[in-house]
Amino acid sequence: MGGQKTHFGFSTVNEDEKAGKVAEVFHSVAKNYDIMNDVMSAGLHRVWKHFTINTAHLKKGDKVLDIAGGTGDLSRGWAKRVGKEGEVWLTDINSSMLTVGRDRLLNEGMILPVSLADAEKLPFPDNYFNLVSVAFGLRNMTHKDAALKEMYRVLKPGGTLLVLEFSKIYKPLEGAYDFYSFKLLPAMGRLIAKDAESYQYLAESIRMHPDQETLKQMMLDAGFDSVDYHNMSAGIVALHKGVKF
């Protein structure tokens, strides 16, 4: 696979280099990730995640896999939904992000299983989870098609995948959004996190991520049925939903 090329932001790199470069970004931003999310989105990321949690049809005792769960926002919500008899796994490929997420949950008295896991090679059995979620993580994966197939594999028949991700903003707002993404965002990263370069990558990675219809087709290709999406904040983010029958 070493000869294959892929995108790292706007740069073209070897596929076997991307994971390491993405890891460097998230090792760098982990400690400031939550405050930067609040600043960058003016708190809207909390609204997007709240909507995602309320979209899921979960009951007490269900099993949930939170992929690229980072600092644990969705895992916390899932745990409240499924109760003590349920099972929620917080996973991330980045040890720094996973440590921050685990510690945050522990500080809130919430003990959940955590796993340092690659979404393209999930360490879970077939047909195990009622719900799989991935928020703001799919765009950083090298082989998104492989990751989606793994998510399909670990879901029970009747289970649901929820993908919350930055997407294609409505066209009249593109100019203002570009100014924000490529001028203001790196400046905020420099000021708050002392790291403009990582936030430049984040802006670029959003632009390189598949748009709403393309991701919908990718989920269908991975085997999901009843795939649909809901735009939020004029398409800045979209929540995709697919079911395994």
UniProtKB/Swiss-Prot annotation:
<comment type="pathway">
    <text>Quinol/quinone metabolism; menaquinone biosynthesis; menaquinol from 1,4-dihydroxy-2-naphthoate: step 2/2.</text>
</comment>
<comment type="pathway">
    <text>Cofactor biosynthesis; ubiquinone biosynthesis.</text>
</comment>
<dbReference type="InterPro" id="IPR023576">
    <property type="entry name" value="UbiE/COQ5_MeTrFase_CS"/>
</dbReference>
<comment type="similarity">
    <text>Belongs to the class I-like SAM-binding methyltransferase superfamily. MenG/UbiE family.</text>
</comment>
<dbReference type="GO" id="GO:0009060">
    <property type="term" value="P:aerobic respiration"/>
</dbReference>
<keyword id="KW-0489">Methyltransferase</keyword>
<dbReference type="GO" id="GO:0009234">
    <property type="term" value="P:menaquinone biosynthetic process"/>
</dbReference>
<dbReference type="GO" id="GO:0008425">
    <property type="term" value="F:2-methoxy-6-polyprenyl-1,4-benzoquinol methyltransferase activity"/>
</dbReference>
<feature type="binding site">
    <location>
        <begin position="118"/>
        <end position="119"/>
    </location>
    <ligand>
        <name>S-adenosyl-L-methionine</name>
    </ligand>
</feature>
<dbReference type="GO" id="GO:0043770">
    <property type="term" value="F:demethylmenaquinone methyltransferase activity"/>
</dbReference>
<keyword id="KW-0808">Transferase</keyword>
<keyword id="KW-0474">Menaquinone biosynthesis</keyword>
<keyword id="KW-0831">Ubiquinone biosynthesis</keyword>
<comment type="function">
    <text>Methyltransferase required for the conversion of demethylmenaquinol (DMKH2) to menaquinol (MKH2) and the conversion of 2-polyprenyl-6-methoxy-1,4-benzoquinol (DDMQH2) to 2-polyprenyl-3-methyl-6-methoxy-1,4-benzoquinol (DMQH2).</text>
</comment>
<dbReference type="Pfam" id="PF01209">
    <property type="entry name" value="Ubie_methyltran"/>
</dbReference>
<feature type="binding site">
    <location>
        <position position="92"/>
    </location>
    <ligand>
        <name>S-adenosyl-L-methionine</name>
    </ligand>
</feature>
<dbReference type="InterPro" id="IPR029063">
    <property type="entry name" value="SAM-dependent_MTases_sf"/>
</dbReference>
<feature type="binding site">
    <location>
        <position position="71"/>
    </location>
    <ligand>
        <name>S-adenosyl-L-methionine</name>
    </ligand>
</feature>
<protein>
    <recommendedName>
        <fullName>Ubiquinone/menaquinone biosynthesis C-methyltransferase UbiE</fullName>
        <ecNumber>2.1.1.163</ecNumber>
        <ecNumber>2.1.1.201</ecNumber>
    </recommendedName>
</protein>
<keyword id="KW-0949">S-adenosyl-L-methionine</keyword>
<dbReference type="InterPro" id="IPR004033">
    <property type="entry name" value="UbiE/COQ5_MeTrFase"/>
</dbReference>
<dbReference type="GO" id="GO:0032259">
    <property type="term" value="P:methylation"/>
</dbReference>
